[in-house]
Amino acid sequence: MYKRQEYANTVKHFLISLCGNFDLAEDLTQETFYQAYKSAHRYNGNCKISVWLCQIAKHLYFDYLKKEKHKTTVGIEHLESFEAVNNQGNLEDTYLIKEETKELLSALRQVKHPYGQVFWLRAYEEMSFKEIGEIFDKSENWARVNYFRAKTKIRKVIEDENNENNM
């Protein structure tokens, strides 16, 4: 049971980073597991189950985009779902962590696909570059290069926002 929940969280967080919509990510997560159940006989074990599930989720999201042809964004009210805050910290630390999380999520939404998703998978889901490459049907080197490009782009977005706020 624990592994299933871990896989569900990985898929949901990946989809949130991909589509920016909490409700859509939940719907697509459910659809991902339904499709995985239907096609379990095709899982060949060449990659981790989490990678296979994220591949299914990615394809479902792109299918959704083809049908809907619209963009969405994450609402600030859903930030708590990322569980980025350590509940044992003091109130000031908790506030600072929440603010940093909001800032990072805002930056992730502003960088182009696939940079935000690659960054999320590496930094938060702790996937290897090989696994990230498999999700996007690309090489390990592609994932590595895009991760470092993502870090640069995210850093620039955050610096630009901080410079705007300090004016």
What does each model-found stretch correspond to?
Residues 11, 15, 40, 53, ...:
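Hydrophobic-face residues of short alpha-helical interaction/recognition segments
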Residues 12-31, 44, 135, 140, ...:
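Short, charged helix-capping/linker segments at alpha-helix termini
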Residues 118-122:
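A short pre-motif secondary-structure segment
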Residues 115, 130, 134-161:
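DNA-recognition helix of helix-turn-helix
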Residues 58-76, 97, 149:
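Arg/Lys-rich amphipathic alpha helix in sigma70-family domain 2
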Residues 33-48, 68:
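Sigma70-family region 2
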Residues 27-34, 47-59:
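Structural recognition of an alpha-helix C-terminal capping motif at a helix-to-coil junction
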Residues 71-98, 128:
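Internal acidic/polar
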